[in-house]
């Protein structure tokens, strides 16, 4: 039976219900994306490279302004400061690594002042005697994983900031995957290799190349926003789009019939098939593109 009637389309239930669903979904997307409703609960471990190359292998330059080390620490503090403004701040843990690993924070904290005090207390020139000057990425990742395993109920992100050339044992990457930890990299002043990209992609993380002067901006903006992106926002927008397609059922039918001179029964079928197509295609697109994963809560 044709959907077309001479009455205005907004007087029919299919239009009204679809319009209401569209409005609700858009409001939910706004609340989740802009106002912080339904936030992800995230634990973040920041592994900071403190090897010799970050201070030009000279104790006189240890954590001095302009060095990579100073830029890394400034970036961590900027992340912690912005994080404190969230309604549900990330729990942050920080470690430093070179030939060995040293914890900088005592467990997790969302207090930027506490994190800054811990950094000032631990990151001193005498630290070189404890951690050496190399880059042992296996130890850095294993330590970060052990730390994040203490927060099993939260979404877990590990970020490694390094200017070194390194390798990671495959079994360590497998352990990271097994515990649903996303491994992310900021590679400072070095080319981003295919292997680093692969390690990040395997665990659902990202790998970015960055200049020393841009570490703070990248960490406190792009990386921060990615860690705190709400996975429900694409879902709400997807439902909004589906609702819009159903809301357009009668308007499309009338357009096909009156503007394109298609028979009313065919116009009705085309408009219904169009709505059904987008109802099926939209969730497939969201899942295939990685915008939404129904099998993961993070």
Predicted segments with their positions:
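Short beta-strand-loop
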Residues: 38, 56-58, 85-125, 137, ...
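C-terminal "exit" segments of structured domains
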Residues: 211-298
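Acidic, polar low-complexity linker/tail segments
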Residues: 2-62, 298
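Sec/Tat-exported extracytoplasmic proteins
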Residues: 51-54, 76-87, 123, 144-152, ...
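Second-shell loop/turn segments in exported
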Residues: 57-69, 101, 105, 123-134, ...
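VWA/integrin I-like adhesion module and closely mimicked acidic/polar interface patches used
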Residues: 128-132, 138-139, 155-157, 162-222
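Flexible glycine-/small-residue-rich
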Residues: 46-50, 96-98, 162
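…and closely analogous acidic/polar surface helices at protein-protein or active-site interfaces
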Residues: 41-47, 52-91, 107-114
